[in-house]
From Swiss-Prot:
The keyword Transport applies. The record marks 31, 66, 99, 252, 385, 447 as: Greasy slide, important in sugar transport. It comes from Cronobacter sakazakii (strain ATCC BAA-894) (Enterobacter sakazakii). It is found in: Cell outer membrane. It is a multi-pass membrane protein. GO terms for biological process: monoatomic ion transport. The record marks 143 as: Important in sugar transport. Involved in the transport of maltose and maltodextrins. NCBIfam families: PRK09360.1 (NF006860). It catalyses: beta-maltose(in) = beta-maltose(out). Homotrimer formed of three 18-stranded antiparallel beta-barrels, containing three independent channels. This is Maltoporin. The gene is lamB. Keywords: Cell outer membrane, Ion transport, Membrane, Porin, Signal, Sugar transport, Transmembrane, Transmembrane beta strand, Transport. Belongs to the porin LamB (TC 1.B.3) family.
Amino acid sequence: MMITLRKLPLAVAVMAGIFAAQASAVDFKGYARSGIGWTGSGGEQQCFQATGAGAKYRLGNECETYAELKLGQEVWKEGDKSFYFDTNVAYSVAQQNDWEATSPAFREANVQGKNLIDALPGSTIWAGKRFYQRHDVHMIDFYYWDISGPGAGIENVDLGFGKLSVAATRSSEAGGSATFQSDSIYDYNKSTANDVFDVRLGSLEVNPGGTLELGVDYGRANARDDYYLADDATKDGWMFTAEHVQTIGTGFNKFVVQYATDALTSQGKGLSQGSGIGISDTDPKFAYAQNNNGHMLRLIDHGSISMGDRWDMMYVGMYQDIDWDNNNGTRWWTVGVRPMFKWTPIMSTLLEVGYDNVKSQRTDETNNQYKITLAQQWQAGDSIWSRPALRVFATYAKWDEKWGYDKTGNPSNNANYGYAVKDGFNGGSFGRGDNDEWTFGAQMEIWW
């Protein structure tokens, strides 16, 4: 009995050590932003985005509280073989009250197995919901290559001259498909599965400090058995991507060329859309039946550079032309810079200047917007990428819009529903007109 009692403290200590080791192995990562702002003409902070533009310049121009909370852990390891479990829950609220209830979005839940195939050392096989090899322009929060969703694949297969990745993901689309029951009664399905098949060849060393990544995505609607899509629904499409990344000191430059067809032109990032036919012709979702047959061309140059000890700068230039057979496409180009002057290793001043120009294919009219933000910031480090950051800001925006999208009524009583129309069409007001505004506030931003 005495021996048993003497062993008890040792057993407790060992178990405590095991649990402590397990607890420390949990990876807690994430992103969050939140703040408070006001509008010069009164009321809460407004945010400014040109009608038809796919994104907006974000510094001093974000009006929500948003967070992604990631928990992950390497749950098994033997030699160089391992399994990793990863999760991500995201939240977004309007930051107008203390208590703002919201249903979180379960963005990620996947398992990644590394070096499990002896013939393919260094590769990873995975399955589940995942943020998959996303490519974005941080300044405008624009994801130009992103097939995230439930899926499976194998990545980083070393071919000697580059690394191969293959994946399949899904994004179901509201609107759905229909089947005939009897006596002219149709049963409408609430969603249609859109499958995407993605192949990438990366890490191609093409010049000193420069690498090339090539990719192709094919997306298609996958209607249930005995269901059908609308006659004019877009059923499939392709997207081709080439991205060159050049190291410039401690910074980088990325040059991107993308070409997409049909179903992959709407979101323009590799996910398929355009298969739905709607619940009924009185439901706004019926507008999804407007097909997006056509093509998209996109050119992007963006990056971040350091100019001495005191100056950093982000920049972006982009041209995007969506040409649809139904003439409801757009031609959008944007250019912006965000220089940063560092007073101390943790205090800086930032100036963001951005311009958007969006021309409607249908109306031949143009919307444009200028946006300027001056911010004083305290951040954890002396890089333009250092976070967390606390900032106070003032933003000025001026816009002149000649067209907008007609969302009057519903598709059953408005033949133009969802289409671009000129401002003043049928006596209505479409777009934001010619105006300007300024806002000011404070914000925190963090990633870890």
